[in-house]
């Protein structure tokens, strides 16, 4: 409702300014005042027009207000202060709009977006930092789909990188296991109910330490072994590459199973190995040379390298300096030994994402997702050199969002720069690096996870984790511990009755996953998160369980009243709510209706800023205002039938909106808690 009325007012103002002053103003600034005493919408447009019209802002505001009256959905307009225009809504009409509800299933926008998230190296178990990436990405996918966009969800798999090489070194040289015995180990672990990703977690830490535990000569030889292993994996067709394929594929399956616990799914898994073997880089290299984005450096520290011009160098070395000078700060894309840097391969990959490469992957089905409430049954595909036919089409997107931590901002900027240099301006403009900061642990959380914490670390606000050092929180361990803690709370409340074992377990899982997802989403992306069990699982304050409990509380109203939200709204349809929206009590209820009406407004804000935290905050504020309403008004014992109908409708709208915004956050709404 808020978004609809905001657009209505903006359109009327644009027309009025053109008609009255001959001005074409595309973007009309509209704000939500901090207090209802100033109305429900406001605009400072008069201040922006003062210089052009050579009038005082207040005079302009008065002229505009005199021509605005009679706009449907608005009770009136007034000038405030030095020239603000405050708009007051027709409250009864606003309630009718909210009851009708802006469509929960938005019409297709026609925009095809691609979101890449998670992208865990397939060399060990997922950890808590990976969860922030996956939850951010999955939530943003839900937001884009809620806005009517077609969204492909991709999870990039670097199965030929140095992290995989480290684990392969561990299997081949620390444990002495050739490919056949690695396969046998996988079967043995499966038979014992043990996990390959956990096994690799420990082996990766051991290998990382092994590189540094010998003499200087031994460590240098081990370093050479590491890069020789990496080269063999990249080249393919040998036993080293076979071990890498077996391990990375097995670990990848475990990652998908871990993420499924959080209701996170993918459509396509593009792998680094196919980008190499299908020669994506060679196709991109030709385009980069032809467009002048790359040049061959013949002098200086980058002699013998293919380097990318910076924006100011206009496609050739020395363009911004004296004749014959070379650009020491140019970005190396192909090293003097012929190897391609990470950025080079990433440029090729993103040309494919936009459908600009002229090459494609082969595709094979890899992982079947079961049918669930949130998603239909569907297949996740993986890249291959020679795929199956028919297959879905991936790539060719109009907009790209890469959920990659903030430390990768420079490489991401280089890819955007390359696209722009090649003339793909529209694609560069629709390439978003969805950056975020790290996840650490509070000292209390580290102790609860069983780690030895020094006296000094106990005084720190947070403790950083390191998979290379073996100090970190595995994602599944974290989820298991959250569920166990929640189950204890659910059992104490005897939710569902003493014999409802499966019901209580299901509720515990819903609360635990909701707590985790909300904790990861409530902080803005540029904030470091210090994870803490007690804070995440609290039923009070800005937490997932607090919002879920508001849903349960609303459902209980209808359960005890012997009715349903749908029936309450149907009974209220057509009634005049104006009489119940005045006075102090009426103001509070109207504020709740207004909060409920912000859903699509917040959705647009989240997408425009690539910031899901706005929706998390909205969900909390809606739950908070509903709880205040619940405590102030005795809905089921209200003696006035008409007022009771209105209060039930208020609860029904609050419940509907809470369930919807929680679903956009990937959080389920329990029936009981």
Labelled PLM ranges:
Residues 1-95, 107-673:
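Non-catalytic interaction-recognition regions
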Residues 96-102:
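Short, charged, solvent-exposed linker or helix-capping segments at domain edges/interfaces
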């Amino acid at each position: 409702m808020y978004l609809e009325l905001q657009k209505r007012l903006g359109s009327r103002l644009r027309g009025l300014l053109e008609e009255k002053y001959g001005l074409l103003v595309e973007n009309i600034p509209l704000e939500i005042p901090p207090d209802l005493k100033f109305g429900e919408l406001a605009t400072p447009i008069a201040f922006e027009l003062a210089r052009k019209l050579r009038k005082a802002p207040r005079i302009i505001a008065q002229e505009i207000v005199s021509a605005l009256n009679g706009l449907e959905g608005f009770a009136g307009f007034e000038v405030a202060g030095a020239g603000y225009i405050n708009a007051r809504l027709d409250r009864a009409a606003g309630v009718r709009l909210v009851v009708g509800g802006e469509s929960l299933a938005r019409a297709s926008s026609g925009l095809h977006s691609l979101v890449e998230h998670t992208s865990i190296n397939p060399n060990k178990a997922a950890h808590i930092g990976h969860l922030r990436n996956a939850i951010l990405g999955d939530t943003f996918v839900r937001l884009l789909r809620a806005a009517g966009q077609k969204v492909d969800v991709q999870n990039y798999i670097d199965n030929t990188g140095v992290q995989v090489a480290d684990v392969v070194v561990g299997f081949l040289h620390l444990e002495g296991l050739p490919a056949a015995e690695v396969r046998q180990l996988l079967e043995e672990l499966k038979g014992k109910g043990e996990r390959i990703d956990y096994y690799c977690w420990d082996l990766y830490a051991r290998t990382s330490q092994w590189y540094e535990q010998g003499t200087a000569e031994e460590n240098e030889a081990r370093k050479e072994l590491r890069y020789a292993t990496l080269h063999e994996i990249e080249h393919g067709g040998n036993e080293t590459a076979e071990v890498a394929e077996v391990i990375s594929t097995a670990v990848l399956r475990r990652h998908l199973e871990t993420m499924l616990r959080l209701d996170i799914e993918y459509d396509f898994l593009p792998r680094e190995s196919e980008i190499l073997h299908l020669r994506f880089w060679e196709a991109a290299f030709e385009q980069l040379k032809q467009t002048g984005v790359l040049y061959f450096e013949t002098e200086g520290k980058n002699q013998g390298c293919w380097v990318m011009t910076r924006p100011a160098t206009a496609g050739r070395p020395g363009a911004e300096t004296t004749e014959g000078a070379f650009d020491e700060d140019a970005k190396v894309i192909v090293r003097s030994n012929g190897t391609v840097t990470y950025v080079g391969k990433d440029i090729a990959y993103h040309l494919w994402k936009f459908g600009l490469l002229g090459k494609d992957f082969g595709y094979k089905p890899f992982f079947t997702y079961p049918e669930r409430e949130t998603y239909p049954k569907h297949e996740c595909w993986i890249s291959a050199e020679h795929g199956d036919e028919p297959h879905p089409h991936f790539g060719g997107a109009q907009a790209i969002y890469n959920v990659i931590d903030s430390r990768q901002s420079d490489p991401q900027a280089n890819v955007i720069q390359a696209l722009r240099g090649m003339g793909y301006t529209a694609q560069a403009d629709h390439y978003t690096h969805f950056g975020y900061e790290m996840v650490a642990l509070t000292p209390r959380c580290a102790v609860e996870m069983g780690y030895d914490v020094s006296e000094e670390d106990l005084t720190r606000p947070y403790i950083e984790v390191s998979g290379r050092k073996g100090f970190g929180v595995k994602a599944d361990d974290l989820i298991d511990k959250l569920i166990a803690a929640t189950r204890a709370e659910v059992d104490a409340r005897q939710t569902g009755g003493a014999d409802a074992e499966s019901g209580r377990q299901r509720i515990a899982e819903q609360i635990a996953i909701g707590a985790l997802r909300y904790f990861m989403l409530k902080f803005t992306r540029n904030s470091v998160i210090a994870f803490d069990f007690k804070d995440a699982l609290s039923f009070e304050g800005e937490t997932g369980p607090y919002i879920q409990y508001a849903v349960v509380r609303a459902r209980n109203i209808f359960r005890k009243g012997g009715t349903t939200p749908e029936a309450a709204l149907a009974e209220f349809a057509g009634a005049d709510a104006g009489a119940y929206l005045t006075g102090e009590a009426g103001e509070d209820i109207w504020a709740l209706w207004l909060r409920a009406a912000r859903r699509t407004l917040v959705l647009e804000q989240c997408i425009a800023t690539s910031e899901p935290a706005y929706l998390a905050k909205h969900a909390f504020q809606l739950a908070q205002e509903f709880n205040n309403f619940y405590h102030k008004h005795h809905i089921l014992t209200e003696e006035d039938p008409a007022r009771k109908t209105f209060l039930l409708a208020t609860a029904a709208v609050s419940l509907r909106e809470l369930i919807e915004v929680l679903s956009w956050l990937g959080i389920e709404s329990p029936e009981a808690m």
